[in-house]
């Protein structure tokens, strides 16, 4: 076929991407993987994780304080909607004093870019920091917390 200059024409397929673009302007990464805090309520990390149980899925959203690595607050629901992170943020804001204005660091998922969440955060005087797109090490302390929690409390257990 090559001698007769016959070639197979192939169509190059594009990779599928669910990325639909930015839904709001991204804020800078103020943390830069430095997860150290001298005092409580200086640097918070937040993320959402899911648990698969026999009845379906449960979504857990929490705020972790970098001072001691413990959760400040958390919420869980069966549907990952705005109420999940808004309720969690409400609970966290309730424990702050007038002198506390922590940086709250998150990844770039839509939960932390909804106008309601942004407005709530700004009213409380919180400074937002975001990871780079698709860069999980930028929020590794929070991801690590979820990993330890699942290993110690969830995996290898029967929930039926």
Task: Kindly give the residue locations of the regions a language model identified.
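Charged DNA-binding/catalytic regions of mobile-element recombinases
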Residues: 1-160
């Amino acid at each position: 076929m090559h001698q007769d200059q016959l070639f197979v024409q192939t169509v190059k397929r594009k990779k599928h991407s669910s990325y639909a673009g930015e839904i709001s302007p991204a804020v800078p990464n103020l943390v830069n993987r430095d997860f150290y805090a001298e005092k409580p309520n200086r640097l918070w990390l937040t993320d959402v994780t899911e648990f698969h149980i026999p009845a379906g899925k449960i979504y857990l959203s929490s705020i972790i304080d970098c001072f001691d690595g413990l959760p400040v607050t958390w919420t869980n629901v069966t549907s990952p909607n705005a109420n999940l992170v808004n309720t969690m943020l409400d609970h966290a804001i309730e424990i702050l004093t007038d002198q506390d204005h922590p940086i709250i660091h998150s990844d770039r998922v839509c939960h932390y870019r909804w106008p309601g969440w942004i407005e709530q955060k700004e009213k409380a005087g919180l400074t937002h920091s975001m990871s780079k797109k698709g860069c999980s090490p930028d929020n590794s302390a929070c991801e690590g917390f979820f990993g330890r929690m699942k290993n110690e409390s969830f995996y290898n257990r029967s929930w039926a």
